[in-house]
């Protein structure tokens, strides 16, 4: 179902109902770009640490706009043994709500726009009809603006609310405004004495003059009139004064308050959908979903925090349970039978033996997708096939049970090992970002950091290390790269051989990370005062954290072919007998259809700790067959 600004409000109840009924959701996003600086290959270095990858994406990807959000809900029908789906395709755009609303600035990447255009993406639906949204801080500020308006209007009997700023004595009026206010008071006196006229429209005036009018009427006419600010077609603001009794005044105020709440909800817009997903506490599925999660939190909750640990805590509070199908397909028992984990190819592979495609049907009133037509890069369709991939893989896990299970639910313990682990693209030895605890810290004692002239190419590096067999090169920038050797004992030889080189420098990974950490500490020390001020106005989602144990799997190795060239590091006879180089170890609740999330982050943390202690058994998954290894479904701790 396509949702734009004009039909968002009328279909919001359908979205809420789908979220409430669903067993799990699948999501996907389309963006205005990926990287505003480095190329994608530089943005995803093979030896990034999780912290480094987070910082890169935060710095170079968050200024783009998530402007299409796909949501597909899945509910299992036990009677007919099939899934009922409801797909939504939301077009999102930060249209300013009023003159004081945030005027969001974002960037576009030409290659991304060109690609989406080639896929038939309709940009007019984004920019002309996109659904507005506010993050939590913007929503808070807008609510304060409404409260301020009600407070200012309180004195003239316009509101039943009490303002601390209401004047209880004559207002001090500037000399240049006294004549204007006297004329207004004179008109109101005529209105009150007239038996025919009930309303008085004042001429458009400035915000300061309107404030003086409200304050003056607050003191001079505490009862008997209703004061309201309206806007002309030309966006000029003016005041309307009406003669009313107390009952009529209260009725009008209730109408006005209801209208303001409706306007506020309209401004919060699409964020209400994200709040509903978060408040449900249900499993959210995505494919290679780290960027989707970062953009969702950044746009609809609050700017991303400075460090990875706080991002993890924030994310698990917003989305208690996440599952990445790309990670799932990349680990056992799927890794050996799935060669390509891209979404389109994965969906095709999971239709073949030994997998069984799930029986799926669109709910009445919702359009159905035909996977044969491959509507890729429409967010709603991508979310739909992501959900299909999850179902097929989850059901395959059920075949290892004794007795086998055809249907594995989203609450089965079989899929727990994959919870809250997000796939890290192109990282050699850290397959995922662990949202629920410390990230993996593989030994990189076989990795070297090399700096060299910017004229060097990949072939130059292969030539330099030609004497060391198979290597893997991961570029950092134009003048540096990581080089992974096949044998750790070769590291010290390479470092010693390059001591007297003039055009390049080689150091161990441990040395490089140590110096980088020292520089970071020095920088942090110099900016310590500003760091103290950074801990304010953070996320306050109303959520139920969900904590699970970590599960790991076995080690795998990576090699790359070497290229022999003229420039090389051939060890001397003396160096060939050196000792091994020193290794360096581097360091489900009821849906609440609320329009804001008022619970502070600290409360979410308390709930997280409580749930860790009170962790309940999910739906029984059955017993594992004796013939299958105990670690069959565990996510690896090394890659």
From Swiss-Prot:
Cofactor-binding details, from the entry: Divalent metal cations. Mg(2+) is the most probable.
GO biological processes: box H/ACA sno(s)RNA 3'-end processing; female gamete generation; lncRNA processing; miRNA catabolic process; nuclear-transcribed mRNA catabolic process, nonsense-mediated decay; nuclear-transcribed mRNA poly(A) tail shortening; poly(A)-dependent snoRNA 3'-end processing; positive regulation of telomere maintenance via telomerase
Family annotation (Pfam families): CAF1, RNA_bind
Subcellular location: Nucleus; Cytoplasm; Nucleus, Nucleolus
EC category: hydrolase
Region annotation (Disordered) ranges: 560-639
Source taxon at top rank: Eukaryota
Modified residues (Phosphothreonine): 631
Residue intervals of the R3H domain: 178-245
Associated disease: Dyskeratosis congenita, autosomal recessive, 6: A form of dyskeratosis congenita, a rare multisystem disorder caused by defective telomere maintenance. It is characterized by progressive bone marrow failure, and the clinical triad of reticulated skin hyperpigmentation, nail dystrophy, and mucosal leukoplakia. Common but variable features include premature graying, aplastic anemia, low platelets, osteoporosis, pulmonary fibrosis, and liver fibrosis among others. Early mortality is often associated with bone marrow failure, infections, fatal pulmonary complications, or malignancy.
Subunit structure: Homodimer. Found in a mRNA decay complex with RENT1, RENT2 and RENT3B. Interacts with KHSRP. Interacts with CELF1/CUGBP1. Interacts with ZC3HAV1 in an RNA-independent manner. Interacts with DHX36.
Protein name: Poly(A)-specific ribonuclease PARN
């Amino acid at each position: 179902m396509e949702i734009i600004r004009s039909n968002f409000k009328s279909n919001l109840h359908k979205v809420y109902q789908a979220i409430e009924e669903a067993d799990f959701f699948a999501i996907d996003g389309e963006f205005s770009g990926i990287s505003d600086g480095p190329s994608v290959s530089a943005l995803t270095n093979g030896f990034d640490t999780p912290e480094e990858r987070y910082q890169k994406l935060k710095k170079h990807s968050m200024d783009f706009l998530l402007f299409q959000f796909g949501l597909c809900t899945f509910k299992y029908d036990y009677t007919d043994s099939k899934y009922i789906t409801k797909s939504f395709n939301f077009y999102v755009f930060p249209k300013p709500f009023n003159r004081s609303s945030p005027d969001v600035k974002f960037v576009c990447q030409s290659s991304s726009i060109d690609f989406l255009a080639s896929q038939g993406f309709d940009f007019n639906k984004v920019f002309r009809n996109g659904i507005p949204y506010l993050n939590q801080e913007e929503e808070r500020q807008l609510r304060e603006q409404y409260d301020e308006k009600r407070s200012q209007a309180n004195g003239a009997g316009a509101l039943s609310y009490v303002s601390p700023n209401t004047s209880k004595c004559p207002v001090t009026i500037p000399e240049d405004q006294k004549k204007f206010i006297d004329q207004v008071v004179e008109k109101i006196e005529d209105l009150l004495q007239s038996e025919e006229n009930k309303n008085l429209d004042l001429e458009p005036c400035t915000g300061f003059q309107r404030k003086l009018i409200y304050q003056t009427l607050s003191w001079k006419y505490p009862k008997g009139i209703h004061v309201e600010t309206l806007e002309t077609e030309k966006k000029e603001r003016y005041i309307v004064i009406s003669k009313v009794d107390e009952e009529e005044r209260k009725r009008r105020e209730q109408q006005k308050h209801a209208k303001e709440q409706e306007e506020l909800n309209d401004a919060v817009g699409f964020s209400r959908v994200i709040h509903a997903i978060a408040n449900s506490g249900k499993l959210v599925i995505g494919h290679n979903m780290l960027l989707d999660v970062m953009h969702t939190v950044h746009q609809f909750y609050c700017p991303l925090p400075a460090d990875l640990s706080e991002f993890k805590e924030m994310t698990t509070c917003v989305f208690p349970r996440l599952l990445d199908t790309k990670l799932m397909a990349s680990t056992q028992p799927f890794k050996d039978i799935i060669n390509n984990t891209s979404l389109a190819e994965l969906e095709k592979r999971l239709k073949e033996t030994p997998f069984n495609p799930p029986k799926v049907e669109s709910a009445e009133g919702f359009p159905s997708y035909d996977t044969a037509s491959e509507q890729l890069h429409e967010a709603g369709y991508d979310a739909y096939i992501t959900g299909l991939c999850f179902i097929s893989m989850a059901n395959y896990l059920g075949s290892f049970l004794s007795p086998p299970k055809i249907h594995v639910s989203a609450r089965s313990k079989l899929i727990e090992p994959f919870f809250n682990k997000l796939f890290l693209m192109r990282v050699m030895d850290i397959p995922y970002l662990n949202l629920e605890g410390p990230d993996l810290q593989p030994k990189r004692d076989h990795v070297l950091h090399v700096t060299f002239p910017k004229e060097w190419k990949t072939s130059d590096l292969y030539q330099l290390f030609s004497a060391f067999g198979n290597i893997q090169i991961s570029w950092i920038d134009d003048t540096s790269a990581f080089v992974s050797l096949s044998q750790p004992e070769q590291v010290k030889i390479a470092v010693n051989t390059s001591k007297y080189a003039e055009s390049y420098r080689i150091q161990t990974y441990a040395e490089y990370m140590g110096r980088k950490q020292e520089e970071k500490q020095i920088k942090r020390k110099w900016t310590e005062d500003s760091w103290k001020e950074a801990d304010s106005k953070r996320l306050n989602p109303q959520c139920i954290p969900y904590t699970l144990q970590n599960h790991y799997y076995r080690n795998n190795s990576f090699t790359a072919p070497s290229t022999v060239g003229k420039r090389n590091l051939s060890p001397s006879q003396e160096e060939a007998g050196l000792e091994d180089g020193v290794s360096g170890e581097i360091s489900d609740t009821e849906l609440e259809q609320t329009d804001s999330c008022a619970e502070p982050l600290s409360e979410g943390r308390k709930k997280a700790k409580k749930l860790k202690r009170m962790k309940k058994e999910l739906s029984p998954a059955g017993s594992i067959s004796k013939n299958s290894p105990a670690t069959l479904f565990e996510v690896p701790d090394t890659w």
